[in-house]
Each structure stands twice: as structure tokens, then as C-alpha cells.
């Protein structure tokens, strides 16, 4: 099985980022590697690229005096240059390499230096040469002259040769620190540019401090962008669009991705507060009004300074996303990459490609791609990605997102990927990939970066937190939550008025953008500006927040996903000749990736079977999460069964990934057909529509979706019983019993389907082994009961020993030695038979399905709230329902034993499993609390199994409620074994206080603290 995918990463331990910007003094072959990004990129990803562009010759090293390059033994000392006069040998180096300068380590001045060779780093000398002290007016005048010369050459006033020579001379003057300047050109320099240059030169005095590097992330780049602008002009003088070189715009973005390509006047600016003054003036990140719906407050005891970099409209602004407790690192300034640098980076990549991005190209797939862009699907995101991560790492993160943890079945490896709704083969197609919104691509990278082991994310402890923070900011800025307006549309301020209200900036589709199909109610959404990609992006954001300690904040994102899915009418099947949303959104030719899709997809601009399946899978995924969170947070259902009553169930994951789509559904009336045609159509249409109650596959849509359908019925029943006016006393008991019996029948149908699933997918050898394992468990249970009776007869002291098998119990807080011995014997039996991977996956599905099914039985007949369960004011413990629920609790604990045998880390469904483990344990806690030493051996063993499972959950998905309940269960198990502490009353009070945090009463919020 996989190692722990979640808790081993301590993401979001943020510290000031080190982003050194390169300037015009670098050669045009160099890449923009700076700060931490340069460390990871050059050490693992871009070393080959750097060697290709940098080469052996380094112009920066060549600028040193000839007699100096042989005397670079000592790394320290004043940087004094001689003027060609022979002098004493200087035991120092004139300049350290970029890596040693960044890491503050000793450098020998060679290329490559010894330090970089030892640690496998890319040795470079491409950073700007700076002088101490404030920049002189003459230097500023030289910069102004160079800028004026660049402007003149780009406007055609000078020939290319003359322009290049002038620029070269200006570069030499500036680099050499010449004191001569041109006064008229200095006067033409604008005051704003002078202020920026002065400010940047003042900040350059603080290069000795790592914190000052963050402050120079923006201004330092602006101060040196003039020479780089000249180099770009010479390389891209044939481009017809002048705005492509505007540092405040993304002129090179393709029109096909106009909605998300350029961050123009309508693009939202999610960063709020005075901390973003350095970026507020950039035209590429204009703001939109903040919505209170998405704002949040900092948790108690968590302070963020006024200069903190926040996401004003994200629920993650004050919350860490890892399983750790709140980290003060989130209050530190985390600069965002300047918009201009993303443009320079993309243009530099375009320069290396054989075909550049055309400013007027519709769609980016027809144009050339960067040489190392392995997956062209990332093309729309390249202009926005900037210097956050290398493109090679982005491709690796895409691979991780679609990685499967099993060779026999398709199962997501990342714990934050709940199920595959996108088809990998279509997504990663080398020539015609699926057309995606940049926000979706950024969210995929963000999700994969949470658990990636890439050196770029692990070389420095704070690297993962900073990279994930930047990817999160990029995702939300591209998504524009609740807005979803294309960037090329008019701004919300100047949008047309509809019935006296300006609605264009609130995510409402404007007149003329609604198709007739949407008006008829068959396809599309009336008044919705979002797309399928936006729903998936919301799912990614909400999933990561739900896995953190701040689960309540995830409801904001889930509500947005559910609402948009309903607006897009994903719960309905589309007509046969419905238009394709892909062609409408991208303005490019239809994306037919393989012969199968083309054969089943119909004519041009008609929705394909793959798009239909995407719609189904997205709907059923949000349907699953809606039912799951209704139990977690004690909330009513959002999505109704009637909304998807005619929607087909998703395909099997393996069939979907292989492109084995269903045949088209015949819409002819069966009464109009002959008998043979009617029987043929019946066989084709024998597909499951609407919610189902039977297990059909190994994936989340096969075994877990039916359980969530039944859970939705239980949630509705529970809220109806607890209604303040129309509750338990408003209807007769017979009506409640009939509804309960119907839900129990659905659970029986699921249990029968599990048996058929076992016979269908489990090999004969595995079935025989399963029967032998069941017999061994029965024998072990009988042996445990005999040992317990012998122990009760022999002694009543706290330190008594179990004589059988010479095994002693040494710790009441751990599982009994007998149970551990039996489990070890079972594991040995399992390993000796060498189950195939397919059999292991089937056994895992059977174990998880059996456990959740038994928990649903408990929820149907028992109580949800732990305090009400312990108080037992209505004497439910003496009813038949309690006896029935107790049997299911023991069966659920036995299923957990099977789960721990085949999935020791509980990594198969860590996002969903915790709440069912908790609700299935409340009843065992009640028995242990009430009966104590009189509890049966099966109950004691079940409590031990529950403790082991919670310990595994804490390692895999470290959440507070699991740690708290593990303490409560340990205390109760100690009392069952006769260990009564002196402060028994205080322990009971602490136990009650911990359980009181999670209430499922009328106004309780469950796990959402």
C-alpha cells in the first residue's frame, strides 16, 4: 500500500519568500531563476536547460579583471578592483555565485563553484551587479537615456543595427558606473519612473537581509526592466501587437482563452488591504468588489499583522490547510509574483520555441509550445504561471494528479482527489488536449502540490507552503468566485442595467449570451456564467479546506459548487444533438481526441459522449459530498433526488479512462417499434438512471455512491424527526416505522449487492481464503472469551497476567495482546497466500462497504449525538433498537479489522472515512461507559479495534476530533478493564467536555467547529 500521503507533509509554514529578479544586464539566453525558485529549479528541473542556454562562457565572469580571476580563494573581504596596476594578491573573490549568495555560503568564485558541485546545484552568475549606497543622479540619468533610446528604436526612429549598438553602449555605461549622463533625456524621464528607480536603489542597500529580498520582488524588477525590454524588442520586433510587450498586460494571450487569459480591467483582484500597495497599481490585477459571503475571520488566538499578505475573498485567508494546528507563519508577508514577470517568463519561453504565440491566434493549441512543456493542456496557464513553479514541475504535478494507487483498478493516489471526473487520456493528449480554463489548471497544480515529493517543494522547509500559497492566489484570481465573467467583458461598474439593477458583475449572464437551449430548460443554465471547469475548481478548493481543521469554512466553497452545478443543470441528461460547451467556450475546433469519441460524438459542435460523462461524474461527485457533509455538519441536504431522477449513473472508472462509452440512447417511442427492435432497445437502455442502492464497481461511484444515496434518506428522516413543530409527535409511530423499514430494505439491497460483487470479482482462491479467515476469526473470538473468563476467575488485581500463550497485558491503553496476536496470525495467513492486486482491491471495497453499511444501520435506528446517547434520558438503552444497533456496532468494528489488514494506513478513502468511524464508535463508548467491567469480550475487542483505527487515522489525516475521541475511548477502555483512577469524576467531566464539542442536536454543527 502507499505510504502516508497526508500527514507527512507540513505545508504552509510560510516565511518571507526570496525572489531575486533578474534585470537587463543578463544575456538573453539566461532563464529567470531567482531565490528559492532558482534553487529548486536549477537543482532538479532546469539544469539541462540552463546548461543549454548559459554554456561555458559566462559574460558576468568575463567582466572581471584578467588578473583577478586567478586569485579567488577567500570568500570574504572588501570588493576592491585595481585599475590594471599590479598590486598585492587579494585572497578573496570579487563575486559569489547566485546560489552561494542566496544561501549565504562560502563560494570559491569558480564556475561552477565547489559548493554547487557538492550539492548538485546549478551555478550561475546572472544576478545584477549592484553598488552600495544610494544611486546617484547620474546613474539614474543613464538609465533614463537607455530607456529613451529603447523607446526610439522600438518606434522605428532608428535602424535595428543602430538600436542594438546604442543599447549595447548604454549597457556598458550603466554597468561600468559611468558618471556621464544626458541631461535632456533625464528631464524626459517621468517622475513616477524616477520614484520607482529611487525606491528600488534604496532597497538594494539591504541585500544583506533575506527579508529585504521580498520587498524587492516587485520594485527591483521594475527598476531593471528597461534593458530587458530592449532585448525583448529586438527579439520580437516582428510581432504585430504592440501590447504584447506592455508589462502591465498580457497581450500575447490567445483570443480563444479570452475569458481567462488576460487579467484585464474586469479581472478580479482578490488581495485586499493596505499590504498590497506595491501591487495595487498594476493593470494586470485590477480589483473587483469584495463580497461578504467569502470573507472570514481569523481563528481565536491567531493574529495577522496589518502588513500580512491576505486573500480577501478566500476562506483560506486566515486558516492553514494542513492537518497541523494554526501556524503563525500565515501572518508573515508572502509576496505574490508581479504580473509583469509572468509576461516576461512566457515571452522568454516563446522565444525558445520554434513558433511563438500569436497575439491574434484563436486558441493556443495550434501554435507552438515551449520545448519542455510536456503537456500542451497547460498552454492557457503559461502566461499566468510566471515564476511560481517551472513548467517541468507543473507537468509532473499533472502526472501526480492523475496517478493511481493501484495497478489493477483506477484509484486516485492523492487524498485530495475524491474521484476522477476528467479523462486522463483526453487531458494529456499530445496534440489536441481537452480545452481547460486556467483556473482549473491552477487548482489541479495546487491540489497536487499538497502531497508532491518533488525536490522543488521539499528542498527547503518553507517551500511547499509558499508555493501552495502562490498557486492558491493564482487559482482564486483566475476563478473570480461567484463572478465567472470573461475578462474581455465590460467591467461590473459599467455593465448594463437590467430592470434597474446592474447585474453584470454578479455572475449573471448578460442579454445575448443565453442560448435558446438554455431558455427552453433542456441544456445549459439560465443566467449562469460559470462552466464545468469552474465547478471542478470549486471542488478542489473545498476539498482541501474540508480536510483541514477549519471545516466550516469549506461550506462556502461547497455551496458555490452545488449552486453552480444546479444552475448548469448537471443533473439532467442532454439531448442527442446538444451543442458542445467546449466549442462555445474556446472558439476552437472540436476536441476529438480518439476514434472512439469521434465515432460516438456526432457531428461538429455537438456534445461528445466524453462531455456527457464529465457532466454526470461532476454531478454525482457533488451529490456524494452533499450527503456526506450533511452527516458531518448536521445540515440538511442541498441537492435533491428529484433533480437527478433521470440522470445516468457514471461509467466504471476503468471503462471511462479507456474511452469505452455507452452507445447512444434511442429516443424513439418503444410502442412505435417492432418486437425485435423493442427488445434490442430494451437491452441498450437497461442502464441505471437516478439514485441507486447497489454496489456496482471498485470506484467511488460504484461502492460509495449507493451508500450516500441511502444516507440522504436517513438525513431527511432524522431532520423530520427533530423538526421543532412537525417532529416525532406530529406523525404516528406507524408512519415513522414504515419509512424506517423502507430505508432498511435499501440497506439490505446494498448488502446483497456486496455479496454478488464478491462472487463476481473475487477469485476462487481468495474466496476460499476469506472463508478460512472467517473461521479463524470465530475461533479467535471464542478463545478470547475463554481467556476473559479465566482472567475474571483468577484475579481482580490491576496487574494480573494472561497465562495462555505467555502473553501479558502491559498497557490498558493499547489493544490486548491476544487481539494483536490473532491479527498478526491473520496477516501471516493473508501474506502466505499471495493475493493478487485485484483481489486486494476487492477485499478493500468489501471491507469499507460493509463498515459504512453497518454505520448507516446505527444512524437509522440510533442516536447521533454523543451527549444525548450517554445521558439516555428516554431510556433508549433498554429498547430493542439499542440491541439491534449494538450488533451493527460490533459488525462495523469487525469490518474495521479487515480494513486494517488490507489498508493499514486507512488511505483508501481518508477524506470520507473519519465520520463513519466516529459515529460507529459512539455506541461502543456508551456500552463501555455503562457496563464497564461487565462488558462482553466482543465489545472490548471492538473498542480495541476502534482505538487502533483512530491511531491510524491520526497518522493519515490528522484532525482534532479524532485525537479527542481516541483519548475518550482509551479512558473508557481502561475502566472496562478495571483500572479506576483516583480522579474518576474529573476524567468523566473532561470526557464530557470533549464530546460536547461535536453535537448533532437541533442546533449542533457536528464536526464544523
From Swiss-Prot:
It is found in: Nucleus. Residues 97-123 bind DNA. GO terms for biological process: DNA-templated transcription. One of its GO terms (molecular function) is DNA-binding transcription factor activity, RNA polymerase II-specific. Its main location: nucleus. The keyword Zinc applies. Residues 141-157, 340-359 have a biased composition (Low complexity). Pfam families: Fungal_trans (PF04082), Zn_clus (PF00172). Disruption phenotype: Reduces growth on D-xylose and xylan, but not on L-arabinose or arabinan. Residues 577-586 have a biased composition (Polar residues). Residues 134-264, 329-365, 576-607 are annotated as: Disordered. Keywords: Activator, DNA-binding, Metal-binding, Nucleus, Transcription, Transcription regulation, Zinc. Transcriptional activator of the pentose catabolic pathway (PCP). Involved in the induction of a variety of PCP enzymes during growth on D-xylose. Has no effect on cellulolytic and xylanolytic enzyme activities. PANTHER family: XYLANOLYTIC TRANSCRIPTIONAL ACTIVATOR XLNR-RELATED. Belongs to the xlnR/xlr1 family. This is Xylanolytic transcriptional activator xlnR homolog. The lineage of its organism: Eukaryota, Fungi, Dikarya, Ascomycota, Pezizomycotina.
